[in-house]
């Protein structure tokens, strides 16, 4: 697996975060939680250097579908491992947009994540048989927080999973440093399911020291 980290490790731009994460971290997830002129200006200035320094995945905005569309237009021709979207409540509008880009870009990975609620599963129910035609970013920490079975999720969607987001939970919130039981369970999944060497796993923590510690822990088999 390729182990990555988010672009929210230190106060600073996307490029400054990439400069800090170090060589042991093999890609950076660019967290783009909204889209406005300031975000576009920063990324336009930094994108060439970002691509020289690191492989990337991209997390598109979560606030408005219009911002998702605008951000996608910016990133669609960039070199990326995977693009992640959250589902939106207007399922028809979201599905129309998702399939309009995913069917056009069949050789590139554009995936839908399971957030900290039921919306992903409700969206799959809405899609019915077409749910087999989506790529999926499996968020391990969100499944733990929602007390959903990792095993059942993987069994249902295994052929569609293109990226995993890994973090822990304290029972009230996710994106916490995982306890040893969680780490052992995650290592077991990765070992038993025989993921490829270039499969992206993003550690979704927002603290540089914790991120580097978890990278070391995951590499210590």
Where are these regions (language model features)?
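Generic N-terminal amphipathic/basic segments
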Residues: 1-25, 30-41
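Histidine-acidic metal/acid-base catalytic patches
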Residues: 1-3, 11-20, 65-74, 79, ...
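Hydrophobic faces of well-ordered beta-strands that scaffold small-molecule active sites
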Residues: 1-7, 26-30, 54-60, 81-85, ...
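Structural motif corresponding to the early beta-alpha repeats
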Residues: 25-96, 173, 198-200, 208
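Short C-terminal domain-edge/linker segments immediately following a structured domain
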Residues: 34-39, 58-61, 114-116, 141-145, ...
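Surface-exposed amphipathic alpha-helices with a cationic face
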Residues: 47-51, 98-105, 127-128, 219
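Conserved anion-binding
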Residues: 104-124
């Amino acid at each position: 697996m390729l182990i990555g980290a988010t672009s929210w490790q230190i106060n600073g731009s996307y490029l400054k975060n990439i400069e800090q994460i170090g060589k042991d971290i093999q890609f950076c997830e660019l967290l783009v939680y909204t889209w406005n002129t300031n975000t576009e200006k920063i990324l336009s200035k930094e994108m060439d250097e970002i691509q020289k320094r690191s492989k990337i995945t991209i997390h598109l905005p979560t606030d408005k579908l219009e911002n998702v569309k605008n951000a996608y237009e910016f990133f669609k021709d960039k070199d990326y491992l995977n693009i992640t979207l959250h589902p939106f409540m207007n399922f028809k509008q979201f599905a129309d947009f998702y399939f309009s880009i995913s069917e056009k870009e069949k050789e590139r990975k554009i995936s839908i994540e399971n957030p900290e609620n039921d919306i992903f599963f409700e969206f799959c129910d809405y899609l019915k048989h077409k749910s087999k035609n989506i790529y999926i970013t499996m968020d391990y920490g969100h499944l733990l927080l929602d007390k959903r079975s990792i095993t059942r999720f993987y069994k249902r969607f295994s052929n569609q999973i293109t990226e995993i987001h890994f973090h822990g939970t304290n029972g009230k919130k996710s994106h916490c440093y995982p306890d040893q039981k969680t780490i052992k369970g995650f290592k077991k999944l990765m070992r038993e399911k025989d993921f490829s060497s270039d499969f992206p796993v993003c550690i979704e923590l927002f603290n540089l020291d914790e991120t580097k510690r978890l990278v070391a822990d995951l590499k210590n088999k």
